[in-house]
């Protein structure tokens, strides 16, 4: 492998999509450090990206060795996709983007953060996790188990047996850019990546798959992006295993098995516990066992696992009303799972993978939902809402409009102007012993820059509520 800096030094690189989540910022800084000549282009305005832009300008001005970054904001230009050495695109760039087609026409490599890292990295073990639901939990669980047990890991390199592998986290994780990990990783290290369908596009373009892959679930999502084609959606997801080799491993939940080709090159492991969270838990445990982590250490890590922010996260209790943040539930299916988990069993049991033992019985959930339509069906969602929810508070969005116009929500419902009003309305409707569940069921765009901004606002509102 070449020195990573030399691979980017003096290269003319267009970064398509800076964003405000930290990933684009992270690899833009890294490439600037490597001496690349950078053009950053984003459809968002300078005002929308002000935090990221200020940080980059401060970063480059702090060293005379770093070239100034050129910004093209509020638009993309074809000229920025010509006469370049590389284009790095962010997740979610349209499949039919004329700018990507322009780069391809000019034989300019189009890369993505994680797949580009793999091309440049030394020999490291890649553990990739994908799935419409469950991938975030499995990714973090695997990382926590391995990070807490690095001393038990063995280096596969025959020349570095005495060096214990280090464990890193990357992929679709808030605030983490994978490419800059090139500064830290060594031969034999382990990288655990959460991989959404967009990042797996990059794997497909590069014809690579992780050494250990986990595929948790597959159901409709991002149909606005894939233009209602489940086939195209699956084609991207399938890159998690498509290019695996004979000694690689694919771990799946049972309902994914029907999607896996019979001529699979790698070894297939199907987990078989009882419920959704247990299956996700079993996937993480299977990875840990493959890497020879002792069972007692796995159990200890699971016991200490506190769950994930924005995923059925218990926040606080106000006047006897428990409040949960399920902000990352951006599909009807995901919100249905949250409603059922809180209605059928205690969430703590679900997160620990413990079989349900006690149900709440009557309807006690006041649901806050709403947002932008992702072109997904709502029939089953409405049935679950009517069965388990006491009331529904809806925030604005095209998906909300679709839900309201259906006229099928039979429980008490209220349409409000914003999230702040939604929380006030929910607290007004909830009684001692009830649950307020913030689980949008729809995307965040239109009202927020991204789902994290929406989740942060909800947490801030709840923090200030009494």
What are these model-predicted stretches?
Residues 1-112, 116, 147, 293, ...:
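N-terminal leader/targeting and accessory segments in enzymes
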Residues 2-12, 27-34, 274-390:
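Nucleotide phosphate-binding/pyrophosphate-handling subdomain across enzymes
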Residues 31, 87, 110, 129, ...:
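Residue-level signal for inorganic ion chemistry
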Residues 33, 78-82, 91-248, 258-267, ...:
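Phosphate-binding loop of NTP-binding sites
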Residues 36-44, 250-254, 366-370, 388-397:
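Short internal beta-strands
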Residues 38-42, 168-169, 192, 438:
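Short beta-strand "acidic-cap" motif of Rossmann-like dinucleotide-binding folds
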Residues 49-57, 378-434:
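C-terminal helical cap/extension that packs against the catalytic core
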Residues 60-66, 158-162, 348-362:
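Short Gly/Ser/Thr- and charged-rich N-terminal loops/segments
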């Amino acid at each position: 492998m070449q020195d990573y800096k030399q691979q980017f030094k003096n290269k003319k690189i267009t970064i398509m999509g800076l964003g405000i989540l930290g990933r684009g910022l992270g690899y833009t800084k890294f490439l600037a450090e490597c001496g690349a000549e950078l053009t950053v282009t984003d459809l968002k305005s300078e005002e929308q990206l002000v935090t990221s832009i200020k940080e980059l300008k401060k970063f480059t001005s702090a060293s005379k060795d770093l070239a100034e970054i050129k910004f093209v904001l509020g638009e993309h230009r074809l000229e920025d996709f010509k006469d370049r050495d590389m284009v790095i695109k962010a997740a979610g760039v349209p499949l039919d983007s004329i700018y990507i087609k322009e780069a391809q026409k000019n034989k300019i490599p189009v890369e993505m953060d994680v797949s580009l890292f793999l091309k440049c990295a030394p020999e490291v073990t890649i553990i990739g996790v994908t799935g419409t639901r469950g991938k975030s939990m499995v990714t973090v669980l695997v990382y926590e188990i391995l990070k807490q047990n690095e001393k038990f890991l063995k280096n596969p390199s025959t020349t570095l047996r005495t060096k214990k592998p280090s464990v890193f986290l990357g992929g679709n994780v808030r605030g983490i850019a994978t490419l800059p990990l090139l500064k830290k990783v060594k031969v034999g290290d382990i990288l655990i990546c959460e991989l959404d369908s967009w990042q797996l596009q990059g794997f497909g373009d590069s014809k690579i798959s992780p050494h250990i892959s986990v595929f948790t679930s597959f159901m409709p999502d991002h149909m606005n992006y894939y233009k209602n084609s489940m086939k195209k959606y699956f084609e991207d997801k399938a890159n998690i295993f498509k290019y695996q080799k004979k000694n690689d491993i694919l771990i799946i939940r049972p309902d994914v098995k029907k999607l896996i080709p019979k001529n699979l090159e790698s070894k297939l492991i199907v987990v078989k516990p009882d419920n959704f969270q247990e299956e996700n838990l079993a996937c993480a445990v299977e990875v840990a066992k493959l890497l020879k982590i002792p069972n007692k250490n796995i159990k200890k890590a699971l016991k200490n696992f506190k769950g994930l922010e924005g995923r059925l996260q218990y926040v606080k209790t106000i006047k006897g009303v428990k409040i949960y943040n399920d902000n990352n539930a951006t599909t009807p299916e995901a919100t249905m799972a949250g409603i059922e988990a809180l209605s059928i069993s205690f969430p703590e049991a679900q997160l620990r993978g413990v079989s349900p033992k006690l149900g709440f019985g009557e309807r006690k959930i006041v649901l806050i939902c709403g947002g932008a339509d992702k072109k997904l069906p709502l029939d089953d969602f409405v049935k679950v809402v009517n069965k388990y929810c006491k009331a529904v508070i809806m925030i604005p969005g095209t998906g909300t409009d679709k839900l309201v116009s259906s006229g099928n929500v039979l429980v008490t419902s209220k349409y409000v102007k914003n999230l702040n009003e939604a929380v006030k309305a929910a607290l007004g409707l909830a009684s001692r012993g009830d649950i307020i569940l913030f689980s949008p069921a729809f995307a965040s765009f239109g009202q927020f820059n991204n789902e994290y901004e929406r989740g942060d606002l909800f947490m801030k509102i709840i923090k200030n509520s009494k």
